[in-house]
UniProtKB/Swiss-Prot annotation:
Protein name: Large ribosomal subunit protein uL11
GO MF assignments: large ribosomal subunit rRNA binding; structural constituent of ribosome
Lineage: Bacteria, Pseudomonadati, Bacteroidota, Flavobacteriia, Flavobacteriales
Gene this protein is translated from: rplK
Post-translation changes: One or more lysine residues are methylated.
SMART domains: RL11
Primary role: Forms part of the ribosomal stalk which helps the ribosome interact with GTP-bound translation factors.
Any Gene Ontology CC annotation: cytosolic large ribosomal subunit
Length: 145
């Protein structure tokens, strides 16, 4: 018989840097999870992504055991990395802060494909381009699709 789910916790934690301090400690402590065990497992799984923000979905069961799924870094974070920005525009419709190419959009879309609800790479690219526009980042060149 399957385990009964008690709670689902979603967090964004830097890869390889989970520790019991906020936001990890309070969120998992309230769910009754062994925080140090989660931190050890998370850091082991994300050691290849040091410093990158990794969304994680933790499923806590009634017997206080847990499973977790690490997702790819958010498109906004990858776009800021590609455009070498610290933050997006405060007024994205008026003030453009950077520009990225369609090749950069494609690499981000290919990386994000498992987490996006898109069937083709072109649709995933248009989703990432929409995120870029909402951040005040222009996409240079003609769309390849």
């Amino acid at each position: 018989m399957a385990k009964e789910i008690s709670k689902v916790v979603k967090l964004q934690v830097k890869g390889g840097a989970a520790n019991p301090s906020p936001p990890v400690g309070p969120a998992l402590g309230a769910a009754g999870v062994n925080i140090m065990e989660f931190c050890k497992q998370f850091n082991a799984r994300t050691q290849d992504k040091p410093g990158k923000i990794c969304p994680v979905q933790i499923t806590v069961y009634k017997d206080k055991s847990f499973d977790f799924v690490v997702k790819t870094p958010p498109a906004a974070v990858q776009l800021m990395e590609a455009a070498k920005l610290k933050s997006g525009s405060g007024e994205p419709n008026r003030k453009k802060v950077a520009s990225v190419t369609w090749e950069q959009i494609r690499t981000i879309a290919e990386d994000k494909m498992p987490d996006l609800n898109a069937f083709t790479i072109e649709k995933a690219m248009s989703m990432v381009a929409g995120t870029a526009r909402s951040m005040g980042i222009t996409v240079s060149g003609d769309a390849p699709f």
